[in-house]
């Protein structure tokens, strides 16, 4: 009789040894950055990194300097922390860094979408055409109508100025931005009330997926959570299917243009459904959280909300409603709000923390701003974490942890774009949208959504925190590296609609 216990044990030892051997044997070569493999074979620093990426990278930078390589789950990541050296990485004139390969694996895992030739360029092309210029103007009009519908027609809010409503600020912002954004991009049927109910149900499922997302990316889910992720993926593929889209009117030109490209490439409808899921996530995953932080900072800083309201009055006039069902709003005003622009940019500096990743597909030499050169090894991943290296750099942004609503304003009220590090002008003084080939193609629409929502809230509503002395919530450390951070807990607030004439 075969003793399967010892046999399986020996087999596991062999497999583990095979997996760990490359990491155990790896040594730092001449000209390479400092190498820190950690104490656990293969895993390296993976657990500390996932527990709190920000604190881990701070420790590594203190230990090794501005460039270092760490082992994370069998993969080697080299972090560059000097923003004055970012330029050549983002331009990649040597063509030795690749973003697409990593991104394709990620979207296949998370959304089930298998990339086709030319779709990355297609997304950027469609976004340039429909999420900027005249295309953006048209979409802003649709978004204003959707916000009016979600915030006024459907909620049944009392127009009595004495009627206060209480809610949780994060959920409030996320729900409104998600539902209005979803309806604006994916269209309506003839039954708009039913559309809103479905959008609300979709939001609830979206939040379930959202909460699992960080650990899903790192494959750290429990068995039941894996089953839940599978259920949610199938649900989104069904609810966002192209067959359902055919029943709707007013699908955005942006989405329609991209789906047309996929059809012309012969992409099956089932894969188009998964593409829609990816686009929903890309368009709605950060605007709600960003709006939450922006409104919370305004409520915690009376001088800031006063300045935004004064600016809004200058460019919009007195706030009013049209037929009590829609906001009267001059969309052109979005281009003339430098104070609000500074508030949003400061919010993103404080709370947007993406990671920029590039696969090194050939040995790559980086010349730092100091003149020192480092060799990056083929197969490693080059990583930038601008939140730590740029946003929180006191040389670039004095008192970096403090919210200053006018940080991005010149004394004359114009936008400030001149920032310096060690006396040298720095081009990348904030990087909330990524940069280079991985820059967010929908950033202009996302900014418009956030600005439009904030302007409607501060001009048409009285707002106050239930507890004015409540401290800002900490960020959820699981979300470092995934765009706009989310709070560790929600904050209660009150609001009431201004009286109508």
UniProtKB/Swiss-Prot annotation:
GO molecular function: heme binding; iron ion binding; oxygen binding; sterol 12-alpha-hydroxylase activity
Pathway: Lipid metabolism; bile acid biosynthesis
Keywords, comma-separated and alphabetical: Endoplasmic reticulum, Heme, Iron, Lipid biosynthesis, Lipid metabolism, Membrane, Metal-binding, Microsome, Monooxygenase, Oxidoreductase, Phosphoprotein, Steroid biosynthesis, Transmembrane, Transmembrane helix
Entry-linked PANTHER family: 7-ALPHA-HYDROXYCHOLEST-4-EN-3-ONE 12-ALPHA-HYDROXYLASE, PTHR24306
Stated family: Belongs to the cytochrome P450 family.
Residues modified as Phosphoserine: 326
Organism of this sequence: Homo sapiens (Human)
Name of protein: 7-alpha-hydroxycholest-4-en-3-one 12-alpha-hydroxylase
Cofactor(s) demanded: heme
Topology term for the membrane: Single-pass membrane protein
Enzymatic reactions: 7alpha-hydroxycholest-4-en-3-one + reduced [NADPH--hemoprotein reductase] + O2 = 7alpha,12alpha-dihydroxycholest-4-en-3-one + oxidized [NADPH--hemoprotein reductase] + H2O + H(+); 5beta-cholestane-3alpha,7alpha-diol + reduced [NADPH--hemoprotein reductase] + O2 = 5beta-cholestane-3alpha,7alpha,12alpha-triol + oxidized [NADPH--hemoprotein reductase] + H2O + H(+); chenodeoxycholate + reduced [NADPH--hemoprotein reductase] + O2 = cholate + oxidized [NADPH--hemoprotein reductase] + H2O + H(+)
Disulphide linkage map: none
């Amino acid at each position: 009789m075969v003793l399967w216990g010892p046999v399986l044990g020996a087999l596991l030892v062999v497999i583990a040894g095979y997996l760990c051997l490359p990491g155990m044997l790896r040594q730092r070569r001449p000209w390479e950055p400092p190498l820190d493999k950690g104490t656990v074979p293969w895993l390296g620093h993976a657990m500390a990194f996932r527990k709190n990426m920000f604190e881990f990278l701070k420790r590594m930078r203190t230990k090794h300097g501005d460039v270092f390589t760490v082992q994370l789950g069998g993969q080697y990541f080299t972090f560059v922390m000097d923003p004055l050296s970012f330029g050549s990485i983002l331009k990649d004139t040597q063509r030795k860094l690749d973003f697409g390969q990593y991104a394709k694996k990620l979207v296949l895992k998370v959304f089930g979408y298998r990339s086709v030739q030319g779709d990355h360029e297609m997304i950027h092309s469609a976004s340039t055409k429909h999420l900027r210029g005249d295309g953006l103007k048209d979409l802003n009009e649709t978004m204003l109508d959707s916000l009016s519908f979600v915030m006024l027609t459907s909620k049944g809010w009392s127009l009595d100025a004495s009627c206060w409503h209480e809610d949780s600020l994060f959920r409030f912002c996320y729900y409104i931005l998600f539902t209005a954004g979803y309806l604006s991009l994916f269209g309506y049927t003839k039954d708009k009330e039913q559309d809103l109910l479905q959008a609300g149900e979709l939001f609830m499922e979206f939040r379930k997926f959202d909460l699992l997302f960080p650990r899903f990316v790192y494959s750290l889910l429990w068995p039941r959570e894996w089953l839940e992720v599978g259920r949610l993926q199938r649900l989104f593929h069904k609810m966002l299917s192209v067959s359902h889209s055919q029943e709707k009117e007013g699908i955005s030109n942006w989405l329609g243009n991209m789906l047309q490209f996929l059809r012309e490439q012969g992409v099956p409808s089932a894969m188009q459904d998964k593409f829609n899921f990816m686009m929903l996530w890309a368009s709605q995953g950060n605007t709600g959280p960003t709006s939450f932080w922006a409104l919370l900072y305004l409520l915690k800083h009376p001088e800031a909300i006063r300045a935004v309201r004064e600016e809004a009055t200058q460019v919009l006039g007195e706030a009013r409603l049209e037929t009590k069902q829609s906001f009267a709003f001059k969309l052109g005003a979005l281009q003339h709000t430098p104070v609000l622009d500074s508030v949003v940019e400061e919010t993103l500096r404080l709370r947007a923390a993406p990671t920029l990743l590039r696969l090194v597909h050939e040995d790559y030499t980086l010349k730092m701003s100091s003149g020192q050169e480092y060799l990056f090894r083929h197969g490693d991943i080059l990583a930038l974490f601008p939140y730590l290296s740029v946003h929180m750099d006191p040389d670039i942004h004095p008192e970096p942890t403090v919210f200053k609503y006018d940080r991005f304003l010149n004394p004359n009220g114009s936008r400030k774009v001149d920032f310096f590090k060690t006396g040298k002008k720095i081009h990348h003084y904030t990087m909330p949208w990524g940069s280079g080939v991985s820059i967010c193609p929908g950033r202009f629409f996302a900014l418009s959504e956030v600005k439009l929502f904030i302007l409607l809230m501060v001009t048409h509503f009285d707002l106050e925190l239930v507890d004015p002395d409540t401290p800002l919530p900490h960020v959820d450390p699981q979300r470092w590296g995934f765009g706009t951070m989310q709070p560790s807990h929600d904050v209660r607030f009150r609001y009431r609609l201004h009286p109508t004439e």
